Amino acid sequence: MDHVNPTLFHLKSLSIFTLTLLYISSPHFLLFKTLSMYENLRIFLKIIPFNLFGMKSVSLIAILLLHLFVSSDTFQLDLFHCKYYLAITWLINRDNECVIYILVGSFICCIVICEVVDKASGSSIPDCSNACGPCKPCKLVVISSTCSASEACPLVYKCLCKGKYYHVPSLT
C-alpha cells in the first residue's frame, strides 16, 4: 500500500485554496474590478505549462485567479497550523508584456506572461502606420501610469519604433 506524504498532500490540496483565499482578501481585487467595469483594459493570459506535483498544467481555477495579483507583495498564511509564504513580484517590459512570478513557500513556482491589449472607448484603435516615418515596425503602445483604486486611469497612447516614442497622429 502506498503512503501519502502528509506535507505533499496538504500542498496539493491547499494550493488552489491558498489562491482563492488571497483572491478574497487581496486589496487589488477592487482595483481589478474597477478596471474591468470601464472595459478599457483587457488582459489575456498566456500560461507557460509547468510540472506541479505531477500535474501537466495549471488548473482552471488558478488560471482565473492569477491575473488578480499584479503587485509586489508578500503574504503570510496560517493554514492548518502550517505557515505558507506567498511572494508575488511583477514587471512590465517595453513591449507592454507583464511577467508575474509567483512562489508559494519553496514548493510552487510558475511564470505567467500576459499581453496588455487596450481598447479606445467610443472609437477605433489609433493608427501608427505613418507616425514613425521611415522607421519600421511602428506599433501602438500604452504608457503606464500609477492610479489609485478610486480613480480611472487615463490611457496614454504612443507609437514605438526601435526604442523611440512618437506621437500618435490621430490623437494630436
Curated annotation (Swiss-Prot):
Q: Does the keyword Oxidoreductase apply?
A: no
Taxonomic superkingdom: Eukaryota
Q: Which GO terms describe its cellular component?
A: extracellular region
Cystine pairs annotated here are C128-C159, C132-C138, C135-C161, C147-C153
The residues the entry assigns to the signal sequence are 1-27
Where does the record place it? Secreted
User: Which of UniProt's keywords are assigned here?
Assistant: Developmental protein, Disulfide bond, Secreted, Signal
Q: Tell me the Gene Ontology biological-process terms attached to this UniProt entry.
A: guard cell differentiation; stomatal complex development
The primary location reported for this protein is: secreted
Against Pfam families, the record matches this protein to:
EPF (PF17181)
Similarity field:
Belongs to the plant cysteine rich small secretory peptide family. Epidermal patterning factor subfamily.
Q: What does this protein do?
A: Controls stomatal patterning.
The protein's name is: EPIDERMAL PATTERNING FACTOR-like protein 7
Q: Which organism is it from?
A: Arabidopsis thaliana
Q: Which gene encodes it?
A: EPFL7
